[in-house]
Amino acid sequence: MKKLELKCRFFEISIPYKEETAFWHKQNVELKIEYQEGNSIGNFSIRKDNVEPEMIREEWKKLKDETESFMLGMMYLGNKKVCSKEDELLYSNNGEKFSIRNEMDIEAIITRSKGEEFNYAYLELPSLVCSGEIQSSPIPLPHKMPYVPLNLKRYILTITQAERLDDYCENYEAEQLKLWFLILEELESNKKDSEYHNIKCARDFVSHDVCDRKDPIEFLKIKLPSAVYTESGHEKARFCRDDKLHIALVSKYQSKARCRARKLVKQEIEKYGGNV
């Protein structure tokens, strides 16, 4: 069988899983997770069968895209720091196995398939070290392969950018609120909804040195009256990071925005045939 196989290693899989191996047969994908001194490495393999030598370049690109879609799916599921290293591209033809490093190797395989001789160098892989952290309470690996269409990549990157701020001891919920709202502003269809309105007002409150627009001022007069003051006859508000009441308000609407944004992104993923 003429087979093309891409092998990668995924690092910093922060969610612990009960199983060490998953087979997603529909996609010809295998994932094996190794735990080493509190760190995790995901050995990932994706295969395409019946690939003629002339089609290696095209199918390689497809396998790389499928691998990136898998990584985005894992990121959505909570592995916010996961990253990959492409280790090896293998091509099998009539019992022979070739490691592909570059265009010359592909040309060598094509030439060899025509019965001509061509010098071919096999690839030797360097050893890699992972430096992630493992949490407690293992969960099952997904029943279906996590998959996010690449046209939705920007939403996953925004989600992970926001969720990585959870890892700092400082409070960055104001910054998280702004990031979540980027998703809401684009994907939310019901912008007249009261919760969306309140999230937007909270976002406006933390986004400006001095907030003086009517909607956020009216919102704050109800939710946080102490933040509103009058200057030169105009009502204004200023976000203070050291005020516990201000932080509590932002935390409340950051949480609401997070839930809403993740739900909207999941709907988009399913709409375009993905799975998380």
Regions found by a protein language model. Give the residues of each.
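Charged, non-catalytic interaction/linker regions at domain boundaries
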Residues: 1-175, 263, 271-272
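Amphipathic, oligomerization/interface secondary-structure segments
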Residues: 2-3, 138-276
